[in-house]
Amino acid sequence: MEETVTVDLSNTYLHYAERTMRQNGLTGREHHYVRADVMRWISDMRQTRDRWDLIFCDPPTFSNSSKMGRRTWDVQRDHAELIIGMSRLLTREGEAIFSCNLRTFKPDIEKMARAGVVLTDITAQTIPEDFARNQRIHHCYIVRRYTVDEAMRLSGLE
């Protein structure tokens, strides 16, 4: 592992992340904790050459934090913009994992495919045995980039 970057608006959650990393032996200057609106951070990072092999994204279902200015966050409404943006931060062979807790979540497959992004649903593989009777505790996807034509074909939209 070369480096990790944790981005969150909340100092509390950044401290939780740092403590969890430390408990797992992941300490040092290669681990960064950034207090920022992730959508703005993604936009800023797209202007750099920094790219990642793996991105893990677990956004809140909803947020109206004053730290976001006038915007609110709604995972159903805003997920495609987030996923497309973070896909642009992946290396060529990179993957992202997108997880959300909205039980009624429906990804906008067409919007993402038109941007060259394909989701592979891995939810069933991420549900602990303790929750076998209630499979709707979250949704989880692998995110990969393709050409738009490939993404449309792989998404069944050609």
Predicted regions and their residues:
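Aromatic-residue hotspot detector
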Residues: M21, M39, F62, F131-A132
